Amino acid sequence: MSLTTLPGVCGIGLRAPHYREALDARPELGWVEVHSENFFDGGTPLAMLRRVAECWPLSLHGVGLGLGSAARPDRGHLASLRRLVDETCPAAVSEHLSFNHSPHRYVNDLLPIPYTRAALDTVAGHVSETQDALGRTILLENLSSYVEFPDNEMNEGEFLAELVRITGCGVLLDVNNLYVNRINLGTDTDAVLAALPPDAIGEIHLAGYSEREGMLVDTHSQAVHDEVWRFYREVIRRIGPRPTLIEWDLDIPPLATLQAEAAKAQAILGGADERS
């Protein structure tokens, strides 16, 4: 199973305010990504997504499976995701390395997990179960976290690398999340990147953070900050060009603003291609 069939260019996270404009104008968007769960109930949103998938390569990005939870993935959720995959034939499917549920409770958030051998065994089982249910490889995204577990036995990059080795999954590298963790927690981002097998990185995310009470918060509500652009350039120099996405989920701007952000990333990707 290949990691993705996304083109090696920059795309955008396509959100509801832009569906009709995008479908009417058919701009050059590279590729688009949507949140999987928004389409589980079918109806008009799914009909719209089918049209989107006919126009641009599509990535399905999940926020609800919680593969880092102790409880197994919800069977109903997996079944809904499989139906969506079958109906839209996405170029990539991804989830977060986070937890959000127990057998009788669900939290609508992306919560961090401990990077221990015990957690690794649990998550690897859930990833394998998910890939078997979907009949394809998924990408796992690194998380923005605001706490660290004192019993961590490895860093996030080492944990993801082990998941890649055990399950054959890929990595969705969120550069903004990694930068936020560097500032908030003092994460050694060089060590995280060094631990990740470059060939396993199938996609990159870029987004804007907010500052709250001296911390950086991954809100996806602003343009990509200059510091993150510089970090992105470092990452691309290190691993080579990768399909890259501009995420913007709150205070969503005009579509043209997203296209302008994507053009910045594309210029960096193009420069890397010229040097290679």
UniProtKB/Swiss-Prot annotation:
Query: What's a Pfam family in this record?
Result: MbnB_TglH_ChrH
Instruction: Provide the disulphide bond pattern.
Output: none
Alphabetized SUPFAM superfamilies for the sequence:
Xylose isomerase-like
Please name the InterPro entries in this protein's record: MbnB/TglH/ChrH, Xyl_isomerase-like_sf
List the HAMAP family hit by this protein, alphabetically: UPF0276
Q: Which family does it belong to?
A: Belongs to the UPF0276 family.
| Record protein name field | UPF0276 protein CV_3513
Tell me what organism the protein belongs to. Answer: Chromobacterium violaceum (strain ATCC 12472 / DSM 30191 / JCM 1249 / CCUG 213 / NBRC 12614 / NCIMB 9131 / NCTC 9757 / MK)
